[in-house]
Design a protein with these regions (language model features):
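Extended hydrophobic alpha-helices typical of membrane-associated regions
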Residues: 127-185
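Multi-pass membrane catalytic core of lipid/isoprenoid biosynthesis enzymes
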Residues: 1-21, 77, 96-136, 140
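Intramembrane alpha-helical segments
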Residues: 1-70, 127, 150-157, 162
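Residue-level signal for inorganic ion chemistry
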Residues: 41, 90, 171
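Residue-level recognition of pore/gate-forming positions within transmembrane alpha-helices
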Residues: 3-4, 25-28, 49-50, 75, ...
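Alpha-helical transmembrane segments of multi-pass membrane proteins
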Residues: 28-32, 74-82, 86, 144-151
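Small-residue-rich segments of transmembrane alpha-helices in multi-pass membrane proteins
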Residues: 45-58, 105, 168-182
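Cytosolic, membrane-interface loops and tails of multi-pass inner-membrane proteins
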Residues: 1, 83-107, 154-162
């Protein structure tokens, strides 16, 4: 049903955006099988979930611009980070059932992987901050994002499903701060 609704929304877009949107369909169909194929289904999910950024760029610019490509990578790394945190909730079941995920792959090094994802996000966002017309406000917001993310990752206990669920849900706060940051550009 969601795919049909998405298709009707896509019909309102220009031709290039429509084609780009349709190119995502095979990936959407393949995604459920990724946990059997690769230890990085979160990456595949990030590529699919973030596809809309490319469609928006195509709709408004008739091409994929550098800034939108950077934003696409921000979204991919964010999905990698939050879905890895989510995957730690049922990591033991995944190992038992031979289901692959970044949580299974990175095991006790999951925090380091998630930290790296958020660091890449902050580096890319710094490019936007540097070029922002509202440098002071965007600097304050990105500093807040960095501090809050650092504290959350330090407190996250990868061995606790409850902790993983809590810090997965904390990504709502990250989303709000990211939204506020994007408003300053």
């Amino acid at each position: 049903i969601l795919l049909v609704i998405s298709f009707f929304i896509l019909l309102e877009f220009n031709f290039k955006s429509l084609v780009l949107g349709l190119l995502s369909v095979p990936f959407v169909i393949l995604y459920p099988f990724m946990k059997r194929i690769t230890f990085f289904p979160q990456l595949f999910l990030g590529i699919i979930f973030s596809w809309g950024v490319l469609i928006v760029s195509m709709q408004f610019n008739t091409r994929i611009t550098f800034d939108f490509l950077l934003l696409y990578f921000v979204c991919i790394f964010w999905t990698l980070a939050y879905d890895t945190i989510y995957a730690y909730q049922d990591r033991s079941d995944d190992v038992l059932n031979k289901i692959k995920s970044t949580a299974v792959y990175f095991d006790k090094n999951g925090k380091r992987f998630v930290q790296t994802c958020y660091l890449i996000i902050l580096i890319i966002l710094s490019y936007f901050v540097w070029n922002s017309s509202n440098f002071l406000l965007s600097s304050i917001i990105i500093a807040t994002i960095a501090i809050c993310t650092y504290i959350a990752i330090q407190k996250w206990d990868i061995t606790s499903p409850l902790s993983s669920n809590y810090y997965f849900r904390q990504n709502n706060i990250f989303a709000i701060m990211l939204f506020l940051l994007l408003q300053t550009f």
